[in-house]
Design a protein with these regions (language model features):
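Detector for repetitive beta-architecture
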Residues: 22-24, 42-44, 61-63, 92-94, ...
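Short, T/G/N/S-enriched strand-turn elements that build extracellular solenoid repeat scaffolds
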Residues: 5, 13-15, 33-39, 51-59, ...
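Acidic/polar low-complexity surface segments
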Residues: 62-86, 166, 170
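Terminal amphipathic helices with adjacent charged low-complexity linkers/tails
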Residues: 155-178
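Glycine-rich anion/phosphate-binding loop at the beta-strand->alpha-helix junction
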Residues: 54-55, 64-67, 72-76, 96-100, ...
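Single conserved hydrophobic/aromatic residue that forms the stacking wall/gate
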Residues: 184-195
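Feature marks extracellular polysaccharide-active and adherence modules
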Residues: 28, 38, 46-50, 57-58, ...
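Terminal or standalone catalytic/regulatory effector modules within metabolic enzymes
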Residues: 1-52, 61-65
């Protein structure tokens, strides 16, 4: 779901004429593979349920929200809500998932922004751009081949160093003035640089 709609939106409006979230579509249930694949700017998909592999594959500006059904008894941060290889090749757009992702989350992401509650092995593999926030544990080999972008990992148990791939990424706790400004005060990196 999303590919055909995105094709028609792009054909009619191009890639930059629509404002974000111009067309919002709500879904309920279990989505199959490639939910929201190639979604373009102007499209917002909201799913109450769960989704299989390749969610947001090739994401190109759309916003995707996936959360548990209202009647669910599950605790979001303890359960997988999206499958493997999510955000594969995404160039822009947003993904917000109230739950964990499977393996290879954000592989080859080059510009999308996402927030999830944990992922399995090989997260952010070959990532070249974009921003990822993971509010939970990550699996082994995190950041293998990652050459760009930023990943922010909530790590209250200090386990991230054991999971990260030390050959390709550098990590640190955000204790500098710049990061405190960016994360807690201003959404603009420029403002944080000027305030120094």
């Amino acid at each position: 779901v999303g590919t055909r709609i995105s094709y028609n939106l792009y054909k009619k409006f191009g890639n930059n004429k629509l404002r974000e979230n111009t067309f919002a579509i709500n879904f309920k249930g279990s989505a199959g593979q490639s939910f929201g694949a190639f979604g373009v700017k102007g499209l917002k998909l909201i799913l109450k349920g769960d989704a299989n592999d390749y969610v947001a594959k090739g994401l190109s500006g759309a916003s995707i929200v996936i959360k548990l059904r209202d009647e669910s008894n599950l605790i979001s941060n303890e359960n997988t809500i999206i499958g493997n290889t999510v955000l594969y090749g995404a160039t822009s757009g947003y993904l917000f998932a109230a739950g964990q992702a499977g393996e290879r989350f954000a592989v080859r992401n080059s510009g999308a922004t996402a927030v999830i509650e944990g992922c399995d092995s090989n997260g952010c593999e070959y990532m070249t751009g974009g921003s990822i926030v993971i509010l939970g544990e990550v699996g082994d080999n995190f950041g293998a081949g990652m050459t760009g972008g930023m990943a922010f990992i909530y790590d209250p148990k200090s386990q991230f160093a054991k999971k990260a791939n030390p050959e390709t990424i550098v990590w640190q706790t955000p204790e500098t003035e710049y990061w405190n400004c960016l994360l807690y005060t201003s959404p603009s990196p420029r403002d944080c640089l000027l305030s120094r």
